[in-house]
């Protein structure tokens, strides 16, 4: 199998070609072919094919003639299925780098949000400690209590905003369903 500049050779199967046209799969196959272990695996597989399977191909020509229409039908169904999957899940046609960046952002979101929340609480505590004044246990306690109250009220306001937004969204959906 000749490979030029990371391009993959065309295949006889519409389903296999359709799979190779999906960027993530294409990039995965190219990475496997460029990896030393992948190259060795391909070489061993090709050698086994040339040694064991290639000599048997003439004997399998007649049975293949009977099976070919069924294989072509299965290939066409596989291609149609992949087309429908692409219509329903268009994200699979995005470039690999874009998918990687999106996944990285989603995975890092809880960590980033946690650090932002921690920073906000410490900042609020520092402001409250400064308002109360003094450097003793009572002032620290007052600052902690006021920080807790402020943070709790902010969370309650945020939850209320989210619920209000979802309520409006639900009303729109209900109105749309009723009117259609």
UniProtKB/Swiss-Prot annotation:
Interacts with class I hydrophobin Hydr1. Interacts also with the cAMP-dependent protein kinase catalytic subunit PkaC1. Disruption phenotype: Reduces the cellular lipids content in both mycelia and conidia. Decreases the virulence on rubber tree leaves. It comes from the Eukaryota. Induction: Expression is positively regulated by the cAMP-dependent protein kinase catalytic subunit PkaC1. Belongs to the perilipin family. The gene is Cap20. Lipid droplet coating protein that regulates lipid metabolism, appressorial turgor pressure, and virulence. Mature appressoria with high turgor pressure are essential to penetrate the leaf surface. It is found in: Lipid droplet. This is Lipid droplet coating protein Cap20. Keywords: Lipid droplet. Its main location: other.
């Amino acid at each position: 199998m000749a490979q030029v500049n990371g391009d993959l050779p065309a295949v006889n199967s519409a389903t296999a070609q359709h799979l190779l046209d999906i960027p993530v799969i294409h990039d995965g196959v190219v990475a496997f072919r460029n990896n030393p272990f992948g190259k060795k695996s391909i070489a061993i597989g090709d050698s086994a094919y040339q040694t064991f399977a290639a000599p048997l191909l003439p004997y399998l020509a007649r049975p293949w003639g009977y099976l070919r229409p069924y294989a072509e039908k299965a290939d066409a169904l596989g291609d149609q299925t992949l087309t429908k999957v692409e219509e329903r899940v268009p994200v699979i046609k995005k470039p690999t780098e874009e998918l990687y960046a999106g996944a990285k952002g989603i995975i890092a979101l809880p960590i980033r949000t946690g650090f932002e929340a921690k920073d906000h609480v410490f900042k609020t505590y520092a402001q409250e400690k400064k308002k109360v004044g003094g450097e003793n246990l009572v002032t620290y306690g007052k600052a902690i209590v006021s920080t807790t109250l402020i943070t709790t009220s902010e969370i309650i306001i945020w939850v209320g905003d989210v619920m209000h937004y979802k309520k409006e969204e639900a009303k729109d959906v209900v109105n749309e369903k009723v009117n259609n």
